[in-house]
A protein has these predicted regions:
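Catalytic-domain carbohydrate-binding cleft regions of carbohydrate-active enzymes
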Residues: 1-193
Length: 193
């Protein structure tokens, strides 16, 4: 576990004091899977078909400068968080993939994760791009990110379509959805306020 967050009394969004585990440590990965297995997977008699791993990067606290995020996320078993920060999701995926296969080698693993890293598909992992604000420019950026992600050789990316309301502003008029072949004329696009 990363200790700086405990020393600084950091609380997660639910209000619990804690930190992230060091996924770069093989023993920590085994412990992480053991907790998932005992409290979820085996407990529900292998009734879990897929995992949705939100927060699969060591984002101990939002809205902090990068130097402080890295201080909260290290040091890792491999070295400084500055050197290994972006690879967290792949070693976290390794823990889940190999953990589930060790318990039930005949069941396919599927993992949806909020953070991606090159090569993660070897662990049956797909990436979800993460939360976005409810603005058209953010949706447009999702399309660009998805194309770039796919061009990097990663086969599957889910884009966030709903987003979070990041600003206090009036809602745009509702947009109509057209269904081809039903004779509806195209409506004017609702302007963004």
């Amino acid at each position: 576990m990363y200790h700086q967050a405990i020393k600084d009394d950091i609380h997660d969004w639910l209000g619990f004091r804690g930190s992230f585990y060091d996924a770069y440590d093989a023993g920590a990965r085994k412990m992480f899977w053991r907790q998932m297995d005992e409290n979820l997977y085996t407990k529900y008699k292998f009734g879990i078909d897929a995992w949705w791993m939100d927060a699969s990067e060591p984002n101990v606290r939002d809205c902090t400068p990068m130097w402080y995020r890295k201080a909260l996320s290290g040091p890792t078993a491999l070295g400084t968080s500055t050197e290994y920060f972006n690879a967290y999701s792949i070693v976290n995926a390794d823990a889940i993939y190999h953990g589930q296969r060790s318990v039930n080698p005949n069941q396919r693993v599927f993992l949806l994760t909020r953070s991606g890293f090159a090569g993660e598909q070897r662990y049956s992992t797909a990436t979800w791009s993460g939360d976005i604000a409810t603005r058209w420019e953010d949706m447009r950026a999702q399309m660009t990110a998805g194309l770039n992600y796919s061009m990097a050789g990663l086969p599957f990316l889910g884009l966030d379509q709903g987003g979070f309301c990041a600003e206090n502003r009036p809602l745009a008029p509702p947009r109509e959805v057209l269904h081809p072949g039903n004779g509806q004329a195209a409506p004017e696009e609702a302007p963004e306020p």
